[in-house]
């Protein structure tokens, strides 16, 4: 830092320069020092300005919290005063006097504190506001610029004169005096230096003595606050001493009364033998029978909870054992002491929850064959568990009643809205199991693994899952596909990872033979050593130098495996990534993933969130990933962040929360989600808007198996498969299509789709995991328009719409061949409709009964299948209703043109 100088020194040297020519040389020699000192002073002033900005922010926070404290004290005073009035109405004068006097004292102290907070705002906050205004700083900056300009002019003139002097020496001339020739430039520098020192001195005075004087005034206000509070306490102190003595005497008197009442109760019990009768009733009620009046739970505790309870064992010793328990979807799971044993799963619909009236921390759960005795940590925790159990039971009971199938026509299934997540979860779990490598354990190769690491997306066996649980949730979060109740969002990563893809990265350096990888018969010690090396040390992972630029590219390209490779090589997801060029600003990993996210990159965002994505890390502008999700309208990323417990109330540099940004940008869905999270009503499990791609395997044994795979997912009531004039009912092998007027149906009734034609294409199930608010994808329905011309019926789009539920026109969907499509033999006449005749009156519906229709296989046939088994069924000269893939046009074909699929 350049050497500092005093204003007095500058005044003395400048005065000497003005008074005598000899002082010009002295001032010229000190000009560089003066310039450097001015720059240093400006830097100090800027630093003080930043500190004052922090003080201003803290003072504002103290002022707002102080006002809140005053409001809470006022509510406390009102409650104490109400209690005193209550005792006064009961003629308890000593107690009422104590409560009322303490309420008055609280009011005085609250008034003093409120005055102190207002003084803080007036004495400290207002001067800070004037200091933070940019007028002083702008004037100082202008003076500094003028000073810099004068210095540059002086240097330029000095260089020019030096050249002239050198030229005069060469030519033999007489060089002039530099000090005299530079007098004007020197005077200009002195002028601007004076102006800058004036501005800087004014700023220093306001930031130093003036602000300190304000703090001294606030100190006096604090001194008065404590003095007045001490005086108020001293005036009440004699009364408090007398009150304490009288309250002690009153307590002793009431205790004597209670003791006498206890003795009287015991004597009455002995006389009337009430103890034996109560024991008899207790034994009777503690059996397997159910009480008529069920305990009602507190709805504030919700329907889901995970934690630890003490369960009384059934052995001879009957000791309390600590067990992990969880309530979800109307079921209670109780873990064992050994992690390899699957937990006990109890359906709450067949259970009854009974609080223990004597032990407030205990409650009983009565099932059909035994009674479980539980104990919580305290009474409040016990109340929470009892309420959650009862609420979950009530919710399951309501879902069961609402999901009953109606007796009227057109009803389909019993799930409705309640069954959609469960059906989708079953379908997604089957898809996860069919991923490459998921038929074997990711670590030991055991067959049929059923334990999922939700943050890594891999399947393991029950033995390896025990070691994963020992690692902790930081490395692996294990859930059971069969015992735990998973939501679609928890299967998001597993659907896009798989054991094979994961091990291609995490076991790339593993020797193919003789390596440390365990087998299905290995002991727990071998498994533990290998899993620690694989998941904690990343010893066998594919090696590469962590490059932030490569991770940036992987996130922008939605490359999940490249992100996994960076994670395996120790890339810190909390460090900012440089942009693709030097001009682009740096981005945090999670911020960038949320910013560029789309529907296909949700698994990548979920992976970063669950594996060290630093949910609450702030960017340079103070925005967290939650702010980015609200700013760029990413509601699905917002759901994943809220599932990861991101903080909702964090503010950025502008003082805005994520909810404020969503409101300002008019992103309604993000705003609703953040409001639910802020109010504590955010619903689990999550339903993200993701294209769930579910494959139908070509190895089905029968049409029933294939139909079960295709129709497992039930559609909501809003999506009707039957249009206004087309009535379709669907059974396993029976399709009835009537083009006449259908029976009117309510909006809540669902009609199933016609039986889809069997092929090995992939079925796209989209939008089934949306939020329960009704934001669901449209489902193509059969139109109610009149039949189209024969040309429209023979179009490829019409044929493909019968072959697959995918949208027509997709390049990946080739038209069916002559054996698979619908075709009409030459010479087949199509009857025309006369006026006033509907298709339902002219043609009978086509019925494919299960008795007359054989099951066909799409896989390879056995050699025993003879030609006789391949004879097609006889055709009937009746039409079959068809529709375009988008539901815009309908038509009919005679049954003679319909051929069953042949291999």
Swiss-Prot record:
Q: In which tissues is it expressed?
A: Highly expressed in primary hepatocarcinoma. Detected in lung, liver and blood leukocytes.
- Which stretches does UniProt call biased (Polar residues)? 829-840, 889-903
Q: Which CDD domains match?
A: ArfGap_ASAP3 (cd17900), BAR_ASAP3 (cd07640), PH_ASAP (cd13251)
Disordered: annotated segments:
740-903
Instruction: Report the main location listed first in the record.
Output: cytoplasm
Q: Where is the composition biased (Low complexity)?
A: 790-809
The residue spans of each ANK repeat are: 585-617, 621-650
Q: Is Coiled coil among the key words of this record?
A: yes
* PANTHER family assigned to the protein according to its UniProt record, in alphabetical order: ARF-GAP WITH SH3 DOMAIN, ANK REPEAT AND PH DOMAIN-CONTAINING PROTEIN 3, ASAP FAMILY MEMBER
| Role this protein plays | Promotes cell proliferation.
Would you tell me the protein name for this molecule?
Answer: Arf-GAP with SH3 domain, ANK repeat and PH domain-containing protein 3
User: What is the organism lineage in this UniProt record?
Assistant: Eukaryota, Metazoa, Chordata, Craniata, Vertebrata
């Amino acid at each position: 830092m350049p050497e500092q100088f005093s204003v007095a020194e500058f005044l003395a040297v400048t005065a000497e320069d003005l008074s005598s020519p000899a002082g010009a040389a002295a001032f010229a020699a000190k000009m560089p020092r003066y310039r450097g000192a001015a720059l240093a002073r400006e830097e100090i002033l800027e630093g003080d300005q930043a500190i004052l900005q922090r003080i201003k922010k803290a003072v504002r926070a103290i002022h707002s919290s102080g006002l809140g404290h005053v409001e809470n004290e006022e509510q406390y005073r009102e409650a104490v005063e109400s209690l005193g009035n209550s005792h006064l109405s009961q003629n308890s004068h000593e107690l009422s006097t104590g409560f009322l006097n303490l309420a008055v004292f609280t009011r005085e102290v609250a008034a003093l504190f409120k005055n102190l907070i207002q003084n803080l705002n007036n004495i400290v906050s207002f001067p800070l506001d004037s200091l933070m205004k940019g007028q002083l700083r702008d004037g100082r900056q202008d003076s500094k610029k003028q000073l810099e300009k004068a210095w540059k002019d002086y240097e330029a003139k000095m260089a020019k004169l030096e050249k002239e002097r050198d030229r005069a020496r060469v030519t033999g001339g007489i060089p002039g005096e530099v000090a005299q020739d530079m007098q004007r430039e020197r005077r200009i520098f002195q002028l601007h230096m004076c102006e800058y020192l004036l501005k800087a001195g004014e700023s220093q005075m306001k930031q130093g003595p003036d602000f300190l004087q304000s703090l001294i005034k606030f100190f006096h206000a604090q001194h008065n606050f404590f003095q007045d509070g001490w005086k108020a306490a001293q005036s009440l102190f004699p009364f408090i001493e007398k009150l304490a003595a009288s309250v002690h005497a009153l307590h002793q008197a009431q205790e004597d009364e209670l003791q006498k009442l206890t003795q009287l109760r015991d004597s009455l019990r002995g006389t009337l033998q009430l103890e034996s009768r109560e024991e008899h009733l207790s034994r009777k009620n503690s059996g397997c029978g159910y009480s008529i009046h069920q305990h009602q739970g507190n709805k504030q505790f919700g329907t889901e909870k995970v934690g630890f309870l003490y369960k009384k064992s059934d052995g001879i010793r009957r000791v309390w054992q600590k067990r992990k328990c969880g309530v979800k979807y109307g079921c209670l799971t109780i873990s064992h002491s050994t992690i390899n044993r699957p937990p006990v799963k109890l359906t709450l619909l067949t259970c009854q929850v009974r609080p223990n009236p004597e032990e407030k921390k205990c409650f009983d759960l009565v099932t059909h064959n035994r009674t479980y005795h539980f104990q919580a940590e305290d009474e409040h925790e016990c109340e929470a568990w009892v309420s959650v159990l009862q609420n979950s039971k009530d919710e399951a009971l309501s879902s069961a009643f609402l999901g009953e199938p109606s007796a009227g026509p057109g009803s389909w299934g019993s799930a409705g809205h309640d069954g959609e997540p469960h059906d989708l979860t079953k379908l997604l779990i089957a898809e996860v199991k069919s991923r490459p490598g998921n038929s074997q354990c990711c670590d030991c190769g055991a067959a049929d693994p059923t334990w999922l690491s939700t943050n890594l997306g891999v399947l393991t066996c029950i033995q390896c899952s025990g070691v994963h649980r020992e690692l902790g949730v930081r490395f692996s979060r294990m859930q059971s596909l069969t015992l735990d109740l998973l939501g679609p969002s928890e299967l998001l990563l597993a659907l896009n990872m798989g054991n094979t893809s994961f091990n291609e990265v995490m076991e790339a350096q593993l020797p193919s033979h003789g390596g440390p990888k365990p087998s299905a018969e290995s002991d727990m010690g071998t498994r533990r050593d290998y899993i620690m090396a694989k998941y904690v040390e990343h010893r066998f992972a594919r090696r590469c130098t962590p490059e932030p630029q490569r991770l940036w590219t992987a996130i922008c390209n939605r490359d999940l495996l490249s992100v996994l490779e960076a994670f395996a090589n120790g890339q810190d997801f909390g460090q900012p990534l440089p942009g693709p060029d030097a001009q682009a600003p740096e981005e945090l990993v999670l911020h960038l993933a949320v910013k560029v996210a789309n529907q296909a990159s949700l698994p990548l965002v979920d992976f970063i969130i669950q594996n060290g994505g630093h949910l609450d890390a702030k960017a340079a502008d103070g925005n967290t990933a939650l702010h980015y999700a609200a700013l760029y309208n990413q509601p699905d990323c917002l759901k994943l962040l809220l599932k990861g417990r991101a903080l909702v109330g964090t503010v950025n540099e502008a003082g805005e929360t994520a909810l404020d940004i969503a409101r300002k940008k008019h992103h309604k869905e993000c705003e609703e989600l953040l409001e639910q999270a802020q109010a504590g009503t955010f619903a689990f499990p999550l339903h993200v808007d993701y294209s769930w791609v579910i494959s139908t395997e070509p190895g089905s044994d029968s049409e029933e198996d294939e139909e079960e795979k295709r129709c497992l997912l039930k559609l909501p009531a809003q999506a009707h498969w039957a249009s206004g004039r087309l009535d379709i009912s669907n059974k396993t092998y029976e399709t009835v299509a009537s083009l006449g007027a259908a029976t009117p149906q309510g909006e809540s009734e669902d009609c199933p789709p016609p039986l889809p034609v069997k092929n090995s294409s992939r079925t796209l199930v989209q939008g089934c995991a949306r939020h329960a608010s009704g934001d669901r994808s449209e489902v193509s329905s059969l139109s109610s328009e009149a039949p189209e011309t024969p040309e429209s019926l023979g179009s490829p789009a019409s044929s493909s719409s019968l072959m697959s539920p995918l949208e027509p026109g997709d390049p990946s969907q080739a038209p069916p061949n002559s054996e698979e499509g619908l075709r009409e033999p030459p010479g087949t006449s199509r009857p025309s409709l006369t006026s006033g005749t509907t298709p339902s009156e002219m043609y009978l519906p086509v019925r494919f009964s299960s008795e007359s229709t054989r099951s066909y296989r799409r896989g390879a046939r056995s050699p025993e299948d003879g030609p006789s088994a391949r004879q097609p069924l006889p055709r009937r000269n009746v039409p079959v209703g068809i529709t375009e893939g988008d539901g815009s046009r309908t038509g009919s074909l005679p049954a003679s043109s319909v051929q069953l699929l042949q291999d």
